[in-house]
Curated annotation (Swiss-Prot):
One of its GO terms (molecular function) is RNA binding. The keyword Transmembrane does not apply. Transmembrane segments: none annotated. The keyword Nucleus does not apply. The gene is nusB. PANTHER family: ANTITERMINATION NUSB DOMAIN-CONTAINING PROTEIN (PTHR11078:SF3), N UTILIZATION SUBSTANCE PROTEIN B-RELATED (PTHR11078). Involved in transcription antitermination. Required for transcription of ribosomal RNA (rRNA) genes. Binds specifically to the boxA antiterminator sequence of the ribosomal RNA (rrn) operons. This is Transcription antitermination protein NusB. It comes from the Bacteria. GO terms for cellular component: cytosol. It comes from Buchnera aphidicola subsp. Acyrthosiphon pisum (strain Tuc7). Belongs to the NusB family. One of its GO terms (biological process) is DNA-templated transcription termination. Keywords: RNA-binding, Transcription, Transcription antitermination, Transcription regulation. The lineage of its organism: Bacteria, Pseudomonadati, Pseudomonadota, Gammaproteobacteria, Enterobacterales. InterPro entries: NusB-like_sf, NusB_fam, NusB_RsmB_TIM44.
Length: 143
């Protein structure tokens, strides 16, 4: 699967997670509805579903992972920034096959596309601090 397919999966997952948080609708129904409107040919659908199901299922744990690296409460974050951080922390915590630098970069790129003017700087700062303090930058992946 091409990396760009996974990037599109993250972008789609972000939009569905945003919608889910605002509407409190069923995440699977939201995903199906969202994908009806998209060209699914260039999206890693399996990864898209992994993200939305994994994040919504383990949302409290992911949020707890984030809290020590935020200088404000989760409730004070914008919905987009919170969703981006959830995707990035999910990848850092659950996907050892994805290099931490990729997770950080993808979070920054999502913030540039969907976030407010300076949200990419905020996302970068939070993720850099988390990677350093949690020791992800020293992680060795054995294949």
């Amino acid at each position: 699967m091409k990396p760009s397919f996974r990037r599109k999966a993250r972008a789609c997952a972000l939009q569905v997670l945003y919608s889910w948080e605002i509407s409190h609708n069923n995440i699977k129904e939201s995903a199906i509805y969202f994908l009806k409107e998209k060209n699914k040919k260039n999206i890693d659908i399996v990864y898209f579903y992994e993200l939305i199901i994994g994040i919504t299922y383990d949302c409290k744990n992911i949020d707890n992972l984030m809290k020590p690296y935020l200088f404000r409460s989760l409730k004070e974050l914008g919905h987009i920034e919170r969703a981006i951080l959830r995707i990035s922390f999910y990848e850092l915590h659950k996907r050892n096959d994805i290099p931490y630098k990729v997770s950080i970069n993808e979070g920054i790129e999502l913030a540039k596309l969907f976030g407010s003017e300076d949200s990419h700087k905020f996302i970068n700062g939070v993720l850099d601090k988390a990677v350093f303090k949690m020791g992800y930058n020293k992680k060795v992946v054995i294949t």
